[in-house]
Amino acid sequence: MIETVPESFFKTRLRGQFHKARVSQPRTRPKRIARQFLCLISVVAMLLLPYSAGTALGKTAPGTRSNKTAARRGSEPKPERLAHAVTIYRDIYGVPHIYGPNDASCVFGYAYAQAQDNFKQVEDSYIHALGRAAEVDGPKALPSDLLNRALEITRLSQEEYQRTTGRIREICDAFAAGLNYYLAHNPEVHPRLITRFEPWYLFAFNRYALYQLFIFGKAGIKDNEIKPASEYKDIAAQIGSNMWAISPQKSADGHAMLLINPHQPFFGPGQWYEGHLHSDEGWDMSGASFFGSPFPTIGHNQYLGWSHTVNEPDIIDLYAEKFDKASDPLAYRYGDGYREATKWTETVKIKTGSGVETKTYAFKKTHHGPVVAERAGEQLTVRLAMLEEGGQLDEWYAMSKSKSMAEFKAAMSKVAIPMFNAMYADRDGNIFYVYNGAVPKRSTKFDWSKPVDGSNPETEWQGYHSFDELPQVTNPPSGFVQNCNSTPFLTTTEGNPDKSKFPPYMVGEGDTPRAQISRRILAKENKFTYEEWAKDAFDTHILQAERDIPALSVDFDKLKQQDPARARKLEPAVADLKGWDMVSSIDSKPMTLYALWFERFGQLKGAGDKDPLLRMKALEQVINDLQRDFGTWKVAWGEVNRLERRDTLGDQAFSDNAESLPTAGGPGWLGVVFNFYTRPQKGEKRRYGVAGHSFVSVIDFGPQVQARSILVFGETADPSSPHYFDQAKLYAQEQFKPAWFALPDIKAHLERAYRPGEETHTMAAGH
């Protein structure tokens, strides 16, 4: 029996989902993916079609020992041989440096190290990637599972593994073997669901991360976690990442330098893990990845480095399909005739208070993609760039093996990675930026801001734009490039791409305050030392305050004329703001006043408050709140803005009574480089970080690559480990740790060395 979802369920989650279905005017630029599809994971219930009792049950859920798909077994390596070949060097911050004779052995060790440090998160990511989250998390996870099943992530991933050969297949096999080896040697670890990992899971994880976390779910940042000024500012445009690169002409030591600065959630599947893989085959990759990735996807090797930020290329389209053949409910119009839709079923297990409930859902798809909604008698299907083709793992692997800018561009020219800006620097002094995306070529005859006619063959995608057709900047005269989830047409001050040379549907972003402050920093005439480069990664100048405080001052002058008594009460606070240097610090009291005022003003404005002196009203409310909670409105920012570590999955509430650290960062919509987004929590006076500067790395590409890095908390999720919260203390002080790269340096700062499965027998440092 099929359970239908109440209409109220859709109303609370369809916000912006099918904007294309409602727009009447042609668009001038692509609508933001985050706005169109941010909550589609909940809409998938619209995919649930009438299910007849005579229809066969769906596929067996993946990830169980009874699963007998063709993709289950590859040429799996002998784990004992791999384990004996690998050495894991843990430096004094717990970062694993994996040394092995070949790339596959390093991946095996990297999987083992991840499982040691946070098996709970690795497994959770894969549970979601397989569309089985409801089995452990209950009904709240059902929308995610249904989207996963609608996108057929399991089938596509199994098929991709089957057609994969060579190194990528070896990597998949080795990663699964590493996780399974960990479970075999740690019987005290009890998985919530997955007792054996299969090689094809890596492809499922890639699809889940790309299409469910980023394209549909905004990287796992919960909408209710960061929403203080969403009605006033376009939060989707401000939550993101920073990346910078400078050429030798801007560097005091004559080397290119790179800043890697993704702003990801501190908890859940989007958090970062740092590691270093060194193979005797020449692979030497250091950086960060999500838990569940087989190697770092941002970072550097001995020749070059790169970073990513989220961008919004138009890689999704909706098609209106006509199912109007009475004799055949699966027939849909196409051209002069009909095509046959495919119908299939999926069985989903859902954890309940009394056990596990099993439900079966029916899905339908055309050649464009799965049916996701019905509008005016037509059924809408969604098409996603590169969902079926895959190839992302191959592209990232080739990027990590590159030795020059030409090789790096050749690796990216596959355009298998459907989105993400990329920024690059190398030891030859080159810098490079590309607005990467698998952007479909489309006929200009149609308005792609709305669902297009699926029966018209002219609406078919005409392939993808090539890598050379994407906006990009190489070695600009300005000597720098930056991207902060911002338009590629303002990447630098000299040498930007010409917007008129690109189709209007290609680029979805405008400028952002973070990009504006970044260009100001990078355009300075002085040359950057490595120390200055590292310091600027945590810059706390508040650009937005330069605009807001003068406007607030004007309104205060009006208030003095209209209500002198009310103005006298606000005068000390206004004076503090006007005298502020507009730089955040943990000791800054004006920063507290301004940041909370900005949020309150946005909330009031978004709620439709038409008070002509709304800025003053917001300031009064913030002052009252601070006096209520702290006994004074003069409260240091570090007293309010805190860093606290809780359970890795993000399910544990913050507490004012738990250990936490003061932090100077602020939300990106204030135009600050040091991004630190907080979540107010009922019953607590302080606010705690949930996203922002999550992994930061600064790299100097001299003859010997020099790097520093920092994770927001530490390398492991084990509260009993010294590496659970050790990096947080540096982070809160806006400091980095060394990211040792050469083996002699690693051994000089070694905590322990061991082979997988033999960690209780620590090897000598000289091994």
Model regions: which residues?
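Alpha-helical protein-protein interaction/assembly modules
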Residues: 586-598
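C-terminal accessory/interaction regions of large nucleic acid-associated machines
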Residues: 636-737
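N-terminal secretory signal peptides that target proteins for export/translocation
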Residues: 1-34
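Bacterial N-terminal signal peptides
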Residues: 39-50
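Signal peptide processing junction and immediate N-terminal pro/mature segment
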Residues: 48-65
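Charged, long alpha-helical assembly modules
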Residues: 596-668
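Mature extracytoplasmic enzyme cores
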Residues: 73-585, 694-767
